[in-house]
Each structure stands twice: as structure tokens, then as C-alpha cells.
């Protein structure tokens, strides 16, 4: 089953380029999250996750989380968010993909379909969760949102969108010493798979989606290793912001 192909999104990628590029950013973010959780011996299974957004990145973030046994309770769009305490399962995600990718519908229709809570004009960060994965837009998570997440017991934040957390939110996460992955590290999957495509095209290679997925996992593990190498503090806490910045600088310096 190749859901993205059935939605008409993947034909281009099937013909030219990597088979799983539409999934790359979302999958890659989850792979980075898994590496972070491993540093604290935390299993993702049954963890409650708040995801924002309902576009490409959010959809594939949720798809991968479901396959790993996590419980995703929120998704959102520019009008508001849904909160489903039973968790978004494969069937419900298929509904969202069809709603968004084919019909350009609104997320509130999910609440009508499945009888769950819909909150107009708000973001999902007030809901209780173990992990938050902002995957919608820039500056969608502010200092107050961060404090609410922390007060509700959130111990990991991994960014799928570009710069979704404001500087105040980032400061709050680092001060609380939770696992916090900035987008420049966690959402690098899309860029990475584009790089794999160039390699494939240049060398006239053809990789299966499984091979590309394996390479994506390895790339995200490598990025995580670099972040730990340059971001680990004396007290053992890994500052992934510093780690990503220094790792990026070292890469440029060596180039």
C-alpha cells in the first residue's frame, strides 16, 4: 500500500527521484525524536503526542508515530485543532489525508465525523501530552504555550516545521532541561532525501522506498550524534540548539 501514490501526490516521485520524499520530513523528525528518547531510555510506545498541522509534514509525522505505537491526540489547521483522546489511528489518519489532500477540507470535519473535541481559533498546546511535535508553521508555539506544556508534564519537543517555537519558548524548554530538538536538526529529513535523489540521479541508481527509509534513519542518527557531540553540557544535558549550531558551523568550516 502506498497511500501517497493513491492520493496522486507521489507520481512525480515514483518517476524521478526517491520513492519516499513526501514522507521524508515527517518520518525524519520522528527518527530524530527516537534518538533523543533513547538517551533517556524512554520508549515511545503508548506515549501521548500532540502534533500541530495537518499538511504533508504533520500527516507523515502522525503516520510514523502510529506505526511505532504512540498515541497521537491532536492535529490542527489555521482554523483550530481537534483533540481525540482515543488517539488518531490509521483509519482516522486516512480520513484526514483524504480530507486535506483531495477535498481541501477543514480539520473541524474530523470532529464531526468522529465525535471528538474541536477548538476554534486555538493551537493544541493546552492539551496534556508527553511529547509535542509542532509541524504547522513559524512561531506557532510561544512562551506561554511552552510553560503550559511543561506544567502538563511534556518532556520532549521535536520540531517538524521551520522555527515553530519562539525564542521565549525555546528558553523555557532549555531551562527546564527537557528534550528539545530545533527544526534545523529534526526536520532535516526532507533536505537529506533530496540529496539522496541527486546521488541516485547522478549515479543512475534506483533505490526501493525501504532502502531510502533506511538511509533516512541513518542520516537522522548521524545528525543526532553530531548534536550530542557538540551540545552535551558538563551536567550531561544535551543542548540540541547549541549542538546543531556548532555542528553546522563545523561542517561549513571544514568545507
Q: Where are the regions that the model predicts?
A:
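Single conserved hydrophobic/aromatic residue that forms the stacking wall/gate
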Residues: 2-9, 13
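Glycine-rich phosphate/diphosphate-binding loop of Rossmann-like nucleotide-binding domains
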Residues: 15-23, 27-128
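Surface-exposed loop/turn and secondary-structure junction residues enriched for glycine/proline
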Residues: 16-18, 22, 47, 85-86, ...
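Hydrophobic alpha-helical scaffolding
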Residues: 19-23, 51-55, 65, 86, ...
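Conserved structured core elements
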Residues: 23, 27, 43-47, 51, ...
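Alpha-helical scaffold segments in soluble metabolic enzymes
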Residues: 28-35, 39, 60, 64, ...
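Rossmann-like adenosine-cofactor binding region
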Residues: 80-180, 185
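Adenosine-phosphate binding glycine-rich loop
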Residues: 150-255
Amino acid at each position: 500500500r502506498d497511500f501517497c501514490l493513491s492520493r496522486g501526490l507521489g507520481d512525480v516521485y515514483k518517476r524521478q527521484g526517491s520513492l519516499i520524499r513526501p514522507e521524508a520530513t515527517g518520518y525524519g523528525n520522528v527518527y530524530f525524536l527516537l534518538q533523543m528518547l533513547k538517551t533517556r531510555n524512554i520508549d515511545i510506545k503508548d506515549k501521548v503526542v500532540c502534533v500541530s498541522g495537518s499538511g504533508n509534514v504533520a500527516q507523515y509525522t502522525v503516520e510514523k508515530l502510529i506505526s511505532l505505537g504512540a498515541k497521537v491526540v491532536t492535529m490542527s489547521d489555521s482554523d483550530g485543532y481537534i483533540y481525540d483522546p482515543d488517539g488518531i489511528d490509521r483509519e482516522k489518519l486516512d480520513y484526514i489525508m483524504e480530507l486535506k489532500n483531495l477535498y481541501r477540507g477543514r480539520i473541524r470535519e474530523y470532529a464531526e465525523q468522529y465525535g471528538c473535541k474541536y477548538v476554534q481559533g486555538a493551537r493544541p498546546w493546552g492539551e496534556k501530552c508527553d511529547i509535542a511535535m509542532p509541524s504547522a508553521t513559524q512561531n506557532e508555539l510561544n512562551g506561554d504555550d511552552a510553560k503550559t506544556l511543561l506544567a502538563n508534564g511534556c518532556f520532549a519537543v521535536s520540531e517538524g516545521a521551520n522555527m515553530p517555537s519562539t525564542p521565549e519558548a525555546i528558553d523555557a524548554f532549555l531551562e527546564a532541561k527537557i528534550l528539545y530538538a530545533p527544526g534545523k536538526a529534526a526536520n532535516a529529513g526532507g533536505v537529506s532525501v533530496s540529496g539522496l535523489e541527486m546521488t541516485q540521479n547522478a549515479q543512475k541508481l534506483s533505490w526501493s522506498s525501504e532502502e531510502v527509509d533506511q538511509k533516512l534513519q541513518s542520516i537522522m542518527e548521524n545528525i543526532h550524534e553530531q548534536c550530542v557531540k557538540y551540545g552535551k553540557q558538563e551536567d550531561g544535558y544535551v543542548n540540541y540548539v547549541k549542538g546543531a549550531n556548532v555542528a553546522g558551523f563545523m561542517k561549513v568550516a571544514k568545507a
